[in-house]
């Protein structure tokens, strides 16, 4: 029996301050985390505070498209 669309999907979180600083070339890279979310409970984009090793501080990481 084939399953339909999976409820718990894999999402990628990317540092928002590294993305903004990318235009100025102040950052050496961008921080990304891979996590899961339940699409029924949180249909909107996920935003979490995570540690960014490039900014050396806790920043907001937002969900990006695959």
UniProtKB/Swiss-Prot annotation:
Example of a GO MF term: structural constituent of ribosome
Report any one BP term from Gene Ontology. translation
Which named protein is this?
Large ribosomal subunit protein bL33c
Similarity section: Belongs to the bacterial ribosomal protein bL33 family.
The protein's organism comes out as Liriodendron tulipifera
Q: Does the keyword Plastid apply?
A: yes
Entry keyword annotation includes Plastid: yes
Q: Where in the cell is it found?
A: Plastid, Chloroplast
Give the highest taxon in the source lineage. Eukaryota
Q: Provide the Gene Ontology terms for cellular component.
A: chloroplast; ribonucleoprotein complex; ribosome
Matching InterPro entries, A to Z? Answer: Ribosomal_bL33, Ribosomal_bL33_CS, Ribosomal_bL33_sf, Ribosomal_zn-bd
- Which HAMAP family does the entry link to? Ribosomal_bL33
